[in-house]
Amino acid sequence: MKISNSERRLRQPIVVVLGHVDHGKTTLLDKIRGTTVVKKEPGEMTQEVGASFVPSYIIEKLAEPLKKVIPIKLQIPGLLFIDTPGHEYFSNLRRRGGSVADIAILVVDITEGLQKQSIESIQILRERKVPFLIAANKIDKIPGWKSNNDIPFLASIEKQRNDVKVYLDNLVYNLVSQLANLGFSSERYDRIKDFTKTVAIVPVSAKTGEGVADLLALLAGLTQRYLETRLKFAEGPAKGVILEVKEDPGLGHTIDVIIYDGVLKKNDTIILGGINGIIITKVRGIFVPRPLQDMKLSKYDLTPIDEVYAAAGVKISAPNLEEALAGSPIYVVEDESKVERYKQQIEEEIKEVRLYSDIDGIILKADSLGTLEALVSALQREGIPIRLADIGPISKRDVIEASIVAQRSKEYGIIAAFRVKLLQGIDTSGIKILYNEIIYQLIEDIKKHINDVREAEKRRTFDTLILPGKIKILPGYVFRRSDPVVVGIEVIGGIIRPKYPLIKEDGRRVGEVLQIQDNKKSLERATKGMEVAISIKGNIMIGRHVNEGDVLYTDVPKEDLEILVNKYPSSITDDMREVIKEIIRIKRKEDPLYGLGLQI
């Protein structure tokens, strides 16, 4: 039924569903829509964005048994769900200073609690100022739970044994504790007195449908009550955001758009952001799915319409959309005099996200404005510097920029690519490119790379140092008396390696460790407590320069000691620390500044 303009007071809220992989967000949406979306998706994971409208009469019908607990008379037309594979597509629901989404459902496996992607989603929701509630999914997996298909949670919980209720409460309070650590007050929804200060937790089972009625009733009631000003219907020209750019058979290049304000009509002039500049074009066709039908499953059921009111998920066909930018704002231009204002507004928004500086930082490329913004934000939280952040495939310029950085800061001389490829024919010149299609995973890959490079550099530097060591020539274990001397020794403290120079207790150099052996097997090192045979090369003879029972030290250069103490303090063992103090006493006889100011 079409609602007349005079009857329109509130638009439908835009609801985004987020959650960790396999926590059940697609299954939950499937249950809400009453379709079999999951079964039509390869690998049971959402492959592309969709938008589904759930009309008010469906919500009221489902929530009928809850009217005593959640009394609602709906004035909103329904709920518009954005089906998102993780927060990658939610990122494109961007709006200056916030998000197009009015409210979010964070789906959490109640048996596992908050996972990495859940926490990352919460951080983005907080940044975009989007209120959310928790769908604590998979209650059917609770030991002893008796499933009751498609009934409200409050009805189902009454049918459970006391020990099962206690078990559920413990799982809920585990979530409450995790959310408290992130700075949020939360509680099971039926125990909340003030929803403005407390995140609601709704126990559900996407598999059996238990709790879905509670979830929908709460969503509709909360948005209608607390977001009324935001939901007020506006009659003016449409404002929206591009979710995805596609090439559709028979339609050419199209854009999937969420209209969050105003009215969009066929033949309207629209202005939007493109990869290489502003695009101004005319709407050739508007297509919408039927209620309870997912946009991405309705390629053959798309209905062409002449106009659409906010909020709605629509497909727009128009000329010159090949370079349209996902995540860009889109505006209807009724008056040519406003073109320049909209153009400037869009350009400023894009400029805020695209970055370039001459610092040593990583090169970041993404497929859309929204994902680029989310990645930049996540990297800034991690303290990872960014030299260049841009949209589109990896170009020769990106490789050159990464090469410049690699010469000075090897750990940052990389290109991180989110859903973009390398342009053909470009030589990467040995520059590492990290690809990933999950935001939090790409961030983890970047962190791992930086850490691996630093650790390798640390090992290289550390391995070139002459480390403190103290040995004793064992009496009765002289195998060769002259150059090279071969003797049995015990390592009293620290470490010795081949090529380490040795000094006596009076500071005189006696030679260099040539080889270390244990039972005729060559060793790279010997540490405290080990008894091994070593050969010493140099002008040395047992009985003349050194004697059985003598104590020798490694001759640690001043610079090596400073690097060891300042850069690698965690590598200094207790026995090595004592050896350092003894070496400092010996070396200061010749150099009073040796080891001065070091915190041993």
UniProtKB/Swiss-Prot annotation:
Residues 44-48 are annotated as: G2. GTP binds at residues 19-26, 83-87, 137-140. Keywords: GTP-binding, Initiation factor, Nucleotide-binding, Protein biosynthesis. It comes from the Archaea. Residues 137-140 are annotated as: G4. The keyword ATP-binding does not apply. Residues 83-86 are annotated as: G3. Residues 205-207 are annotated as: G5. Disulfide bonds: none annotated. Residues 19-26 are annotated as: G1. Gene3D superfamilies: P-loop containing nucleotide triphosphate hydrolases, Translation factors, Translation initiation factor IF- 2, domain 3. Signal peptide: none annotated. GO terms for cellular component: cytoplasm. One of its GO terms (molecular function) is translation initiation factor activity. It holds the Pfam family GTP_EFTU. One of its GO terms (biological process) is translational initiation. Residues 10-227 form the tr-type G domain. Function in general translation initiation by promoting the binding of the formylmethionine-tRNA to ribosomes. Seems to function along with eIF-2. Belongs to the TRAFAC class translation factor GTPase superfamily. Classic translation factor GTPase family. IF-2 subfamily. This is Probable translation initiation factor IF-2. It comes from Saccharolobus solfataricus (strain ATCC 35092 / DSM 1617 / JCM 11322 / P2).
